[in-house]
Amino acid sequence: MIKEYYGAETFILNKDFAYILVIGTTDVSLIPGLTIAGATPELTHFTPAADAEYVLLGKCKSINTIPVSPTGIPTPALLTRASLSFINPLKIVVNAGSRIVPKIPYIDLQGEPGKDIRKQALSMEKVNNIIENSIKLGEELSNEYELIMIGESIPAGTTTAMATLLALGYDAMDKVSSASPDNPKELKRKVVEEALRNLPTDPLQRLAKVSDPVLLGVAGTSLGFKGKILLAGGTQMTAAAAIINEFDKNKLKDITIGTTKWIVEDKFADMLSLAKQVGVKVLASMLDLSISAYEGIRAYEKGYVKEGVGAGGSAIMALVKGVSNNTLVRKIDELYGELVGSSNLHI
């Protein structure tokens, strides 16, 4: 089942599409307690590369196993790979600025890893590189596709998303989600408030100060693409949509955010109000993982992880193509079972 918000319609998704995964890192993820998108703060810099490797290969090369939270909850890349296995679209990994680059073929936007937003996230040179090169990528994809789905992987990305939305004038404080069921709102607020001090007046310079390479790469690819776009992600994609709207006020009519029920139902965030402020449509997958055989998968129903790597959008695409909830969960369990059998993953 798929829920539609703000005029979103699933019929636009009945097309062949390409899956674009934009990866990057921000040093904000090194702040203790801010994100659980990795077993330790230091390992969060390996998460995007490992996510990309797993989606494409079914195994990771940059680390020994798939990224997990400190309590062993698996990366949403597992859900993405399971969903896309029923469709088999073209998959492209785009490096917007990852500290660890994946050991697979990828497109490089000539960006840089994001630094601590409390000081300066990105240089203007790299901001321009990311935007210009991703626009060109979107233009090239337009030659082959009428629809693309863009996912993201960047630990601490909800914090940089909140800073980005606030810097662009939206009411976003405390409204973004977290990979943890215990959203570290006070810490996020403290980091973001410090980042927003002495902001420059120019919007692009504001983004260089407080944003991250992935948001810019997602926005640029969308700006260059001529067809319909499914931004596969949660509150981070509302920030990407806000950047898109800053550059082109007419573009959002072609854009829908595709996410999970765990994002739209998150009591500690308000993704739908952010989407409404920005003016972007939303679809949410009602995928139910409570029937999974594995505790690590069922944990998603308790508010862990929630979204990432295009998990919600990928589930939506599978459901649109007629894959049932039970069939999709069985596939997720099958893939997770293979990983558990070959590693020391928690179950």
Swiss-Prot record:
InterPro entries: Nict_dMeBzImd_PRibTrfase (IPR003200), Nict_dMeBzImd_PRibTrfase_arc (IPR002805), Nict_dMeBzImd_PRibTrfase_sf (IPR036087). One of its GO terms (molecular function) is nicotinate-nucleotide-dimethylbenzimidazole phosphoribosyltransferase activity. It comes from the Archaea. Belongs to the UPF0284 family. This is UPF0284 protein M1627_0030. It comes from Saccharolobus islandicus (strain M.16.27).
